[in-house]
Amino acid sequence: MAEIKNYCLNFGPQHPAAHGVLRLVLELDGEVVQRADPHIGLLHRATEKLAEHKTYIQSLPYMDRLDYVSMMCNEHAYCLALEKLLGLPVPLRAQYIRVLFAEITRLLNHLMWLGSHANDCGSSTMLMYTFREREDLFDMYEAVSGARMHAAYFRPGGVYRDLPDSMPRYQASKIRNARALAALNQNRQGSLLDFIADFAQRFPGCVDEYETLLTDNRIWKQRTVGIGVVSPQRALNLGMTGPMLRGSGIAWDLRKTQPYDVYEHMDFDVPVGKTGDCYDRYLVRVQEMREANRIIGQCVAWLRANPGPVITDNHKVAAPGRAAMKSNMEELIHHFKLFTEGFHVPEGEAYAAVEHPKGEFGIYLVSDGANKPYRLKIRAPGFAHLATLDEMARGHMIADAVAIIGTMDIVFGEIDR
């Protein structure tokens, strides 16, 4: 009787390291991975098809729910594609606000990735550290949109509203004494820009804390150095983008190579790795957090000095202001028509891509002249990255497969769509 050497193991979909609903069928020789077969589709919600039955504005909130860790970056790509079709100019202040919140979103994403990736590899402390900073970033989301996650803040032609002049404050309660309350509200006395500036000033110290815990940690290096190595040419051939591509040594960043909004005016560097392993991708993302913080500082300085409109004055696309709507019946009718019937987009097609925290996130829109898209195609970076898992995991131990899944920073909202 022949000896059975290899056996199959189901990893997920209810596994804490699966980062969502990944079902991974692993063929193992002992603890060594011989083949990894990802099964996707467990979070499929037909977003692309739904968009064909919704007006252009009604489709916007669906974008938040694709990669639900990088909400506004998804909206950004959708709005850019729609503005291309409409030939719609965006006010300069709105562009700066978009870039500001795109980088805030990058920090949100990378903090989530760092905490969960380290937790998967056995360092649960990192999760507590990173979520401490994420709370402040969510407060920024809440201040402009009223929602802590699914903001729907970016709009075709600009953003929903200007930055508020005050920050919400913590109220007195039985669980906080006056001293604790004063400490919580210390940096909330001014405007949202003051709050963001305060965060940007202290955030580099937080990143230093993360690096103290991980960068030279012997166990962390043993779990990541030499794991999941991808050569530069192979990374290109596999369709990798974002930190996955830059970790292999290729300095491709859409904010530099194909700048959109006001990224050409921003001063920042593009970090790249050398060996293309999990450790290099970790270093790239950590440095990206520092660079994103630099961009946030530049946006805050410009926005303080330059007031102006934050959405286009094209009333066929932009909704009237609340004050006008409450005092003028025509404005109220216009608002109602815009949000029920929507606006018609000229016939044509457009592709817009942004440097999403996970890679190149693209939206391909086809219009037939109606108030709904004829076709909406989403180019999700995680889809291409997950397809490389089999190649990256072969020959590694099963515990290393967890580190490789973590380094990909995958979210199934965008992969399954």
UniProtKB/Swiss-Prot annotation:
EC code: 7.1.1.-
GO cellular component: plasma membrane
Gene3D superfamilies attached to this UniProt entry: Cytochrome-c3 Hydrogenase, chain B (1.10.645.10)
Catalytic activity, reaction form: a quinone + NADH + 5 H(+)(in) = a quinol + NAD(+) + 4 H(+)(out)
Quaternary structure annotation from Swiss-Prot or TrEMBL: NDH-1 is composed of 14 different subunits. Subunits NuoB, C, D, E, F, and G constitute the peripheral sector of the complex.
Job description of the protein: NDH-1 shuttles electrons from NADH, via FMN and iron-sulfur (Fe-S) centers, to quinones in the respiratory chain. The immediate electron acceptor for the enzyme in this species is believed to be ubiquinone. Couples the redox reaction to proton translocation (for every two electrons transferred, four hydrogen ions are translocated across the cytoplasmic membrane), and thus conserves the redox energy in a proton gradient.
Record's protein name: NADH-quinone oxidoreductase subunit D
Source species: Verminephrobacter eiseniae (strain EF01-2)
